[in-house]
Amino acid sequence: MIGRERMTVVSQRMIAERTYELTLSGQLVAQMNEPGQFVHIKVAEAADPLLRRPLSLCQIDHKQGQCIIIYRQEGKGTALLTQKQPGDRVDVLGPLGHGFPLDAAPAGGRALLVGGGIGVPPLYELAKQLANRGVNVVSVLGFATKAAVFYEAEFAAFGETYIATDDGSYGMAGRVTDVIEQQGLSFDVLYACGPKPMLKALDERFRGRPVYLSLEERMGCGVGACFACVCHVPGSETAYKKVCSDGPVFRAGEVVL
């Protein structure tokens, strides 16, 4: 069920270059269950910026009534969000969308988690929940450069973890797809979130396998009303799906990337 609440900022810190970890508390956390879902945050009390910012859930802690969101400062909206201090209130709408299907990974099976840049955060809660279900988790995380790397140790706590950087300044040089091939990583199910070229490469490479992709799209309303985030369905010029309400997670081949 979608709710709305002025959640309280518990803490905020920079964890990598232009990347922030924001912890919020509130009753809305009780409704957050699916890894891969997101929230829509109003970053300022004023009307400018008008639109909310869609930010994925990184961690859900029902006992503490807290959730963690990791985001990257890109423009005016996220710059305003970086100024939030403990005790401040933030207008939050959510949880939104459909997350990663946990049942696709059998207990004792092997799940490969592939993240690129700011697509890494939602995979953390996924890794945690899969590990709790007895799934063997392997993570491949890609970043532009060493300064952008975050949560390596956190993912490593759940299983084998590989880091790739575009410039080779940390971990393995190259793309996440290079790491998968070079390391010969096998899987029963693959979950991924990141830039569209990365998702497209995974879609093409592993078509026909159990692969689930979380799309990152600009959106207006977050609830399927404004049609700002639609993507086409293969084989049709008129059919489409909405990333915010039908997704953001889709099975590989379900939508055109």
UniProtKB/Swiss-Prot annotation:
Gene3D superfamilies hit by this protein: Dihydroorotate dehydrogenase, electron transfer subunit (2.10.240.10), Nucleotide-binding domain of ferredoxin-NADP reductase (FNR) module (3.40.50.80), Translation factors (2.40.30.10)
Give a yes or no for keyword Iron-sulfur in this entry: yes
Question: Which GO MF terms does the UniProt record name?
Answer: 2 iron, 2 sulfur cluster binding; electron transfer activity; flavin adenine dinucleotide binding; metal ion binding; oxidoreductase activity
UniProt-listed GO biological process terms: 'de novo' UMP biosynthetic process
A Pfam family that the UniProt record links to this protein:
NAD_binding_1
Cofactors demanded by this protein: [2Fe-2S] cluster; FAD
Q: Does the keyword Iron apply?
A: yes
Q: Which UniProt keywords apply?
A: 2Fe-2S, Electron transport, FAD, Flavoprotein, Iron, Iron-sulfur, Metal-binding, Pyrimidine biosynthesis, Transport
- Cofactor details (free text): Binds 1 [2Fe-2S] cluster per subunit. Binds 1 FAD per subunit.
The FAD-binding FR-type domain covers: 2-102
- Residues bound to [2Fe-2S] cluster: 221, 226, 229, 244
Regions annotated as coiled coil: none
Q: Which PANTHER family match?
A: DIHYDROOROTATE DEHYDROGENASE B (NAD(+)), ELECTRON TRANSFER SUBUNIT, DIHYDROOROTATE DEHYDROGENASE B (NAD(+)), ELECTRON TRANSFER SUBUNIT-RELATED
Query: HAMAP family of this UniProt entry?
Result: DHODB_Fe_S_bind (MF_01211)
Q: What is this protein called?
A: Dihydroorotate dehydrogenase B (NAD(+)), electron transfer subunit
Q: Which gene encodes it?
A: pyrK
